[in-house]
């Protein structure tokens, strides 16, 4: 990779933080702000003691971050994993959430210690070509996530209206709801955080209700959760496992969390305050992901119980003999396994457990789609500002992301079938998994650099764990790329996929190389990359 070889000179302004040389002229900040400029004060407490008041003050960024673990992409991944593998992949969900927590801990620590988010650090350390490719891939991840939110919301509106709102109509409605969130943002950060906590509570109630009425077999569920095995599994189950990892650990969410923690007033000149902030953010993130894990577990268990090895004919018979018999026609009368999606999932729940289950499912799906809208906007804003130093108003950023997401979703909704919309959602989950190294590798790199993180750099044990994460993510994606090539519909696609694969592997190799340098591999140090080992020039 080539690009800028001389890193910009930086100066240390406070404990563990760095700042760029100021640009000439006043900063250009559009009206309406582009950043979480409101700072939440942290109450005083006796040093060395745990304070619930302090935990409450630090509570917010972790729950906003956890929304990415509950977006429609996750719900789709959960229900399909349950339908394809029953309870066999519950352990993948558990350990993917644990790995997600480790990554989010590193993201929060980077933001607290340096006072900068991951995008800003990437801008300072990576040469122009790699950081531009990184930025483009993160924008792709954000647009892909927003497309999933559009798809989930459109299907939710269709279910709630008993089909009166067509899918394309639901897609267009998502344009309107964005203005509501921009309006809500004017009421302050704490109220915004409270609203998203309310949406998480709705999801916990709705999907928890489905879990109670479905009554999954608890013994089989616990075995699937704590015994890592998958007897009789093939490529469909493997692809679902990859989809779970990609849906749970969202690449842009790591960039988002490193920025959200900057909304709390932390005195970065005092190591005690930094250590305390790291502790409280870790506790909050653990609680938030604990909640998100159980919500995902509810969905996967419900569909593992209701859909596993279910045939289309069986689903047709169930609906034909229920009060929702008009929906039976969506299931072909054959003995193939049901290809479950958002829509069919809601219908079969309604046929099995009554119309209330259908509408409660749709409300939960709607909450999942709506809650992810604003966090995706923030992520896009932080990524753009960090990588490009380009500041847009939140309205402009939201309009750009939603426009890019709506157009392909609208075309599929108008000209294709519902199944095509759900297939697009599956593809987007795999895309998130493929893009994951472009968030995981940078965060592992920078949190391992003593020159940047000082005494808060990852220790030997953490480096072993995080390096294992890096190898696992890269191995999963390499296996997927190799497995995917034979399934291409036409040989003409091979050239395009091969070109993209070369770029993908080239960027991944570069990121692994710089990560190894940051971990102390001095033999790999090139003169233009010494700052990954020794830090930026003072």
UniProtKB/Swiss-Prot annotation:
<dbReference type="GO" id="GO:0000165">
    <property type="term" value="P:MAPK cascade"/>
</dbReference>
<keyword id="KW-0406">Ion transport</keyword>
<feature type="topological domain" description="Cytoplasmic">
    <location>
        <begin position="514"/>
        <end position="538"/>
    </location>
</feature>
<feature type="region of interest" description="Disordered">
    <location>
        <begin position="1"/>
        <end position="36"/>
    </location>
</feature>
<feature type="transmembrane region" description="Helical">
    <location>
        <begin position="493"/>
        <end position="513"/>
    </location>
</feature>
<dbReference type="InterPro" id="IPR001046">
    <property type="entry name" value="NRAMP_fam"/>
</dbReference>
<feature type="topological domain" description="Cytoplasmic">
    <location>
        <begin position="262"/>
        <end position="286"/>
    </location>
</feature>
<dbReference type="GO" id="GO:0032496">
    <property type="term" value="P:response to lipopolysaccharide"/>
</dbReference>
<feature type="transmembrane region" description="Helical">
    <location>
        <begin position="347"/>
        <end position="367"/>
    </location>
</feature>
<comment type="function">
    <text>Macrophage-specific antiporter that fluxes metal ions in either direction against a proton gradient. Localized to late endosomal lysosomal membranes, delivers bivalent cations from the cytosol into these acidic compartments where they may directly affect antimicrobial activity. Involved in iron metabolism and host natural resistance to infection with intracellular parasites.</text>
</comment>
<dbReference type="GO" id="GO:0006828">
    <property type="term" value="P:manganese ion transport"/>
</dbReference>
<feature type="topological domain" description="Extracellular">
    <location>
        <begin position="416"/>
        <end position="432"/>
    </location>
</feature>
<keyword id="KW-0410">Iron transport</keyword>
<keyword id="KW-0812">Transmembrane</keyword>
<feature type="transmembrane region" description="Helical">
    <location>
        <begin position="165"/>
        <end position="185"/>
    </location>
</feature>
<feature type="glycosylation site" description="N-linked (GlcNAc...) asparagine">
    <location>
        <position position="321"/>
    </location>
</feature>
<keyword id="KW-1133">Transmembrane helix</keyword>
<feature type="transmembrane region" description="Helical">
    <location>
        <begin position="469"/>
        <end position="489"/>
    </location>
</feature>
<keyword id="KW-0967">Endosome</keyword>
<feature type="transmembrane region" description="Helical">
    <location>
        <begin position="55"/>
        <end position="75"/>
    </location>
</feature>
<dbReference type="GO" id="GO:0005765">
    <property type="term" value="C:lysosomal membrane"/>
</dbReference>
<feature type="topological domain" description="Cytoplasmic">
    <location>
        <begin position="368"/>
        <end position="394"/>
    </location>
</feature>
<keyword id="KW-0472">Membrane</keyword>
<keyword id="KW-0458">Lysosome</keyword>
<feature type="transmembrane region" description="Helical">
    <location>
        <begin position="140"/>
        <end position="160"/>
    </location>
</feature>
<keyword id="KW-0813">Transport</keyword>
<feature type="glycosylation site" description="N-linked (GlcNAc...) asparagine">
    <location>
        <position position="335"/>
    </location>
</feature>
<dbReference type="Pfam" id="PF01566">
    <property type="entry name" value="Nramp"/>
</dbReference>
<feature type="topological domain" description="Extracellular">
    <location>
        <begin position="215"/>
        <end position="240"/>
    </location>
</feature>
<feature type="transmembrane region" description="Helical">
    <location>
        <begin position="433"/>
        <end position="453"/>
    </location>
</feature>
<dbReference type="GO" id="GO:0005886">
    <property type="term" value="C:plasma membrane"/>
</dbReference>
<dbReference type="GO" id="GO:0031902">
    <property type="term" value="C:late endosome membrane"/>
</dbReference>
<dbReference type="GO" id="GO:0010008">
    <property type="term" value="C:endosome membrane"/>
</dbReference>
<dbReference type="GO" id="GO:0015086">
    <property type="term" value="F:cadmium ion transmembrane transporter activity"/>
</dbReference>
<feature type="transmembrane region" description="Helical">
    <location>
        <begin position="194"/>
        <end position="214"/>
    </location>
</feature>
<feature type="topological domain" description="Cytoplasmic">
    <location>
        <begin position="1"/>
        <end position="54"/>
    </location>
</feature>
<dbReference type="GO" id="GO:0030670">
    <property type="term" value="C:phagocytic vesicle membrane"/>
</dbReference>
<feature type="transmembrane region" description="Helical">
    <location>
        <begin position="395"/>
        <end position="415"/>
    </location>
</feature>
<comment type="similarity">
    <text>Belongs to the NRAMP family.</text>
</comment>
<feature type="topological domain" description="Cytoplasmic">
    <location>
        <begin position="186"/>
        <end position="193"/>
    </location>
</feature>
<feature type="transmembrane region" description="Helical">
    <location>
        <begin position="287"/>
        <end position="307"/>
    </location>
</feature>
<feature type="topological domain" description="Cytoplasmic">
    <location>
        <begin position="103"/>
        <end position="139"/>
    </location>
</feature>
């Amino acid at each position: 990779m080539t690009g800028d070889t001389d890193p910009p000179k930086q100066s240390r302004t406070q404990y563990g933080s760095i700042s760029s040389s100021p640009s000439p002229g006043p900063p250009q900040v559009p009206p309406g702000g582009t950043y979480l400029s409101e700072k939440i004060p942290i109450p005083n407490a006796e040093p060395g003691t745990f304070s619930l008041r302090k935990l409450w003050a630090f509570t917010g960024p972790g729950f906003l971050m956890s929304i990415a673990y509950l977006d429609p992409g996750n719900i789709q991944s959960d229900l399909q994993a349950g339908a394809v593998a029953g309870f066999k992949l519950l352990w993948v969900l558990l350990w993917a959430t644990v790995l997600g927590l480790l990554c989010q801990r590193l993201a929060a620590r980077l933001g607290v210690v340096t006072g900068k988010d991951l995008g800003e650090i990437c801008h300072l350390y990576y040469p122009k070509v790699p950081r531009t490719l990184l930025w483009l891939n993160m924008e792709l991840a954000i647009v892909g996530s927003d497309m999933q939110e559009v798809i989930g919301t459109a299907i939710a509106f269709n279910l709630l209206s008993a089909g009166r709102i067509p899918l394309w109509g639901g897609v267009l409605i998502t344009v309107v709801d964005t203005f509501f969130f921009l309006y809500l943002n004017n009421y302050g950060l704490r109220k915004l955080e409270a609203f998203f906590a309310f949406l998480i509570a709705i999801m916990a109630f709705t999907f928890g209700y489905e879990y109670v009425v479905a009554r999954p077999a608890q013994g089989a569920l616990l075995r699937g959760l704590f015994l890592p095995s998958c007897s009789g599994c093939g490529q469909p189950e493997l692809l679902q496992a990859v989809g779970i990892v990609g849906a749970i650990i969202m690449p842009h969410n790591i960039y988002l969390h490193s920025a959200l923690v900057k909304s709390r007033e932390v005195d970065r000149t005092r190591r005690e305050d930094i250590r305390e902030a790291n502790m409280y953010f870790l506790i909050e993130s653990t609680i938030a992901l604990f909640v998100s894990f159980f919500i995902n577990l509810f969905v996967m268990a419900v569909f593992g119980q209701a859909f596993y090895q279910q045939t289309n004919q069986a689903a047709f018979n169930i609906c034909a003999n229920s009060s929702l018999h008009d929906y039976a026609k969506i299931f072909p009368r054959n003995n193939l396994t049901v290809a479950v999606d958002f829509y069919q999932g809601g219908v079969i729940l309604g046929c099995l457990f009554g119309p209330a289950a259908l509408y409660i499912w749709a409300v939960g799906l709607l909450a999942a789609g709506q809650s992810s809208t604003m966090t995706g906007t923030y992520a896009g804003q932080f990524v753009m500002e960090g990588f490009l130093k380009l500041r847009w108003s939140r309205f402009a950023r939201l309009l750009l992301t939603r426009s890019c997401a709506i157009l392909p979703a609208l075309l599929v909704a108008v000209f294709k079938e519902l199944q095509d919309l759900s297939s697009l959602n599956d593809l987007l989950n795999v895309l998130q998994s493929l893009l994951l190294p472009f968030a995981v590798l940078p965060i592992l790199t920078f949190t391992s650099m003593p020159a940047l993180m000082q005494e808060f750099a990852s220790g030997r044990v953490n480096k072993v764990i995080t390096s294992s994460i890096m190898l696992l993510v890269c191995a999963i994606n390499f296996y997927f790329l190799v497995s995917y090539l034979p399934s291409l519909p036409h040989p003409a696609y091979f050239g395009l996929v091969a070109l993209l694969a070369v770029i993908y592997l080239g960027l991944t190799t570069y990121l692994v190389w710089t990560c190894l340098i940051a971990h102390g591999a001095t033999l790999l140090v090139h003169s233009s990359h010494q700052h990954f080992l020794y830090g930026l020039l003072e």
